């Protein structure tokens, strides 16, 4: 086998390896993208639900404040003031819990995305190792054949 023939074989083999790398890399990237999109979609849905709860809590505080302002007698104003303070305390507490839950959801999503990124990077490293091994095996087989000839 001539040097030119060996170079032709290696060029063809490199093209095959590059096509395989491109295909598998594309699969890895698509799987990663789907995971990240699913994480972000779930996060958005959960946050939207929590924001609705928060808005309801704020609306309840506003209703109590309006009732206090619109009270017609001093006695009723005092009662509405007490009610408003109670409602405000409860709803502010609820809002703090909601904010904390949103922060926790974001943290968990960030960790999940980091795990997906690490998994993707690991799969890409494995792919590179497999392709390198195939390349090295082909080079060895060509050298062995060259020695036999």
Regions found by a protein language model. Name each.
Residues 2, 6-9, 13, 17-21, ...:
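The feature captures the hydrophobic core positions of alpha-helical coiled-coils
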């Amino acid at each position: 086998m001539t040097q030119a023939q060996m170079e032709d074989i290696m060029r063809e083999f490199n093209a095959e390896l590059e096509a395989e790398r491109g295909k598998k890399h594309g699969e890895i990237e698509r799987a990663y993208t789907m995971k990240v999109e699913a994480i972000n979609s779930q996060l958005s849905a959960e946050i939207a639900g929590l924001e609705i709860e928060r808005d309801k809590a704020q609306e309840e505080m506003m209703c109590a404040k309006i009732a206090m302002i619109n009270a017609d007698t001093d006695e009723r104003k005092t009662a509405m003031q007490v009610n408003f303070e109670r409602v405000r305390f409860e709803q502010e507490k609820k809002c703090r819990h909601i904010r904390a839950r949103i922060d926790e959801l974001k943290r968990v999503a960030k960790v999940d995305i980091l795990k997906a990124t690490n998994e993707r990077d690991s799969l890409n490293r494995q792919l590179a190792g497999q392709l390198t091994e195939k390349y090295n095996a082909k080079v060895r087989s060509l050298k062995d054949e060259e020695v036999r000839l």
